[in-house]
Amino acid sequence: MNVSKYVAIFSFVFIQLISVGKVFANADERMTTFRENIAQTWQQPEHYDLYIPAITWHARFAYDKEKTDRYNERPWGGGFGLSRWDEKGNWHGLYAMAFKDSWNKWEPIAGYGWESTWRPLADENFHLGLGFTAGVTARDNWNYIPLPVLLPLASVGYGPVTFQMTYIPGTYNNGNVYFAWMRFQF
């Protein structure tokens, strides 16, 4: 190899290493913002929320029929939360909820949720949201060992009533579950 190839390879590697430093710096900033949002929601909530589970649906393309025939898809339970809207109009919430899972066993979950919120109509009460939740759950079939979760969130709402949902990804006969609930804001 001639010198110009070595210079090109060295330059490429050097640029990649510089980029990694920027990524970690941005990750630190995002983590600080994440912690501050949780603290502010806990310390300065605007609303108290009631959570009522509405539906659990197992994606039929990802399950054997005999399994889905046995699964519970009508979770019942409830939860409580604290929430606020930030200066950009985005939703932040802390919550704890318990519901009957696919096996009709109790599953608790607690965490933080964030949604970027849009108000596409002239009526400001109507809102759409897209974001994430990060928390901890525990399941009977995992001996109630605490399991971390990081899941997408989506919602449609009017005023203080919101239909909020997530999708739990998975493999064949495991995961691939749509879960939704009503959130009433007081």
From Swiss-Prot:
Site entry (Role in lipopolysaccharide recognition), positions: K67
Major localisation: membrane
Keyword match Transferase: yes
Signal peptide: 1-25
Protein EC: 2.3.1.251
Enzyme active site: H58, D101, S102
Disulphide-bonded residues: none
Biological role stated in the UniProt entry: Transfers a fatty acid residue from the sn-1 position of a phospholipid to the N-linked hydroxyfatty acid chain on the proximal unit of lipid A or its precursors.
Oligomeric form and interacting partners: Homodimer.
Protein name from the UniProt record: Lipid A acyltransferase PagP
Organism: Shigella flexneri
